[in-house]
Amino acid sequence: MRCLPVFIVLLLLIVSAPGFDARPKTEDDVPLSSFHDDLQRTVRTLLDIRMCCLGTSGCCPWG
């Protein structure tokens, strides 16, 4: 029965904790949107090269 007040206090402390990460960002903390943007840029570049290779003979980087 003595554990119940301690448990309630711990629950109140957890609930009142900040909802964000208080650690400073490092170089390794890259947002997921950055990876998504890189993927879109790569796909767009590959599609542009493919369309260029179909239309113009001297445009294709690999011949």
From Swiss-Prot:
The keyword Disulfide bond applies. Contains 2 disulfide bonds that can be either 'C1-C3, C2-C4' or 'C1-C4, C2-C3', since these disulfide connectivities have been observed for conotoxins with cysteine framework V (for examples, see AC P0DQQ7 and AC P81755). Keywords: Amidation, Cleavage on pair of basic residues, Disulfide bond, Neurotoxin, Secreted, Signal, Toxin. InterPro entries: T-conotoxin. GO terms for cellular component: extracellular region. Residues 20-49 form a propeptide. Residues 1-19 form the signal peptide. The keyword Secreted applies. GO terms for molecular function: toxin activity. Coiled coil: none annotated. Expressed by the venom duct. Pfam families: Chi-conotoxin (PF16981). The modification Tryptophan amide is found at residue 62. It is found in: Secreted. The cysteine framework is V (CC-CC). Belongs to the conotoxin T superfamily. This is Conotoxin PnMRCL-0111. It comes from Conus pennaceus (Feathered cone).
